[in-house]
Amino acid sequence: MEHHQPEHPAPGETRTAEAVSPENHKVLSEPKEHPQDKDAKEADGAAGEQEPVDQASLPAQGQDNFESPPPDASSSQPGPARETRPETETAGACSRLQELPQSPRARQPELDFYCVKWIPWKGEQTPIITQSANGPCPLIAIANILFLQWKVKLPPQKEVITSDELMAHLGDCLLSIKPQEKSEGLQLNFQQNVDDAMTVLPKLATGLDVNVRFTGVSDFEYTPECSVFDLLGIPLYHGWLVDPQSPEAVSAVGKLSYNQLVEKIITCKHSSDTNLVTEGLIAEQFLETTAAQLTYHGLCELTAAAKEGELSVFFRNNHFSTMTKHKGHLYLLVTDQGFLQEEQVVWESLHNVDGDSCFCDSDFHLSHSPGKGPGTGGGSGSPEKQRQVDQDYLIALSLQQQQPPPQGTSGLSDLELAQQLQQEEYQQHQAAQAAPARAPSPQGRGAASGRPAAERRQRPKQESDCVLL
């Protein structure tokens, strides 16, 4: 590599005398064995083999350390004496080498942005973050709570935000928290929790490891990930509970977490004890029948545990959602990017385990399907009509809870019975609406069940009139 020096003695002679230090002169004077007219192609090939070594160390060492590299890197030292062509080639090789390992990371941030939706929330324009199908739901769920609590604010009319910005806002909130107790021991414990939360913070953009316990809606196996929720004062809930009226399932599941229950099922299946095999089959059946990770008993307990007006995070099917309770009913924040332009779609009711729900605006008034035309009863009706719809809907829910239990349902609680009756009513309504063709939309599921129960009760009567005629 050092034989390049004799090729251009004149152009860089004075510069070489200044640039080459005594220690470098020793290196340059060693290769006397090279012929003066060495093949340039072999020299360029050797330079191509040596340059990647130099460039690989550039990001770590920087160009300041370039004057004192190991002997294998000294071949690039005479570069300034050979005019500018070798520097250009070196810079090009450096850029190419840096792009190769960094290209996946370089493309990631370009796609790692999320649209901001502005909604009227308690009299103030408030941003919420929407997500695509593969968005980081833990980060978005927590960030939306901070936005709805006005602990984090964005510039007006901001339309796009990156996950790095969200994590920066979240990190600022964590660092701004101060311990309530001033004892030295509690302060050390608090600082340790903050350190754990800051370590876990990057995982929010990819997903959290959460292990539920089937004993309560707020029972999770404690992991460092849970410290983020604890420090921010955000409740974390789930609704995957065992029905206490199934003693076999209660005995099989016990107080185990999900991971422990899966291990138990595998162990029991390979056991020679028939009782253990049976217990394993019962536990497996519980997981299969509750694959939605939400049971009616869990929904009842969740409704009772959540506080009125409280903002929390709801975990279900490996997805984290922002949840609140309004007038005794649970609602999930609609963060699907498909509803970005739907101003009347902000909340989605959570009143059964089968996914039937109705959409509401930011004031929890029922909203209609975005695809409906104004002639079909949808769209923005008069405020009086909207209030009447909301009132009918709430009356229907109250009547469902006051109805006497039918035969065969005496073992159900009042709230569970109300959920069951409401589910039957929704199914009847969907059957009545099956005749007219409707354009498919991502909100069709909620729109079919979004009509008030008062309207749905009138439809069978209208159909019976037609039959009589």
Curated annotation (Swiss-Prot):
User: Recorded E.C. number(s)?
Assistant: 3.4.19.12
Basic and acidic residues bias spans: 23-44, 453-469
Q: Which reaction does it catalyse?
A: Thiol-dependent hydrolysis of ester, thioester, amide, peptide and isopeptide bonds formed by the C-terminal Gly of ubiquitin (a 76-residue protein attached to proteins as an intracellular targeting signal)
Task: Please list the GO biological process terms of this entry.
Answer: proteolysis
Q: Which domain of life is it from?
A: Eukaryota
What the entry lists under InterPro entries is as follows: MINDY, MINDY_domain
Name the active site residues.
Answer: C137 (nucleophile), H319 (proton acceptor)
Q: Note the site residues: Ubiquitin-binding.
A: D414, L417, A418, L421
Q: Which residues are recorded as modified (Phosphoserine)?
A: S103, S441
**Gene Ontology MF: a single term:** K48-linked polyubiquitin modification-dependent protein binding
Q: Where is the composition biased (Low complexity)?
A: 415-448
Q: Which residue ranges are recorded for the region named Disordered?
A: 1-105, 401-469
Q: Where is this region: Ubiquitin-binding domain (UBD)?
A: 388-428
One of its Pfam families is MINDY_DUB
Top enzyme class: hydrolase
Function as written in the Swiss-Prot or TrEMBL entry: Hydrolase that can specifically remove 'Lys-48'-linked conjugated ubiquitin from proteins. Has exodeubiquitinase activity and has a preference for long polyubiquitin chains. May play a regulatory role at the level of protein turnover.
Q: Identify its protein family.
A: Belongs to the MINDY deubiquitinase family. FAM63 subfamily.
Please state what the protein is called. Answer: Ubiquitin carboxyl-terminal hydrolase MINDY-1
- Gene encoding this chain? MINDY1
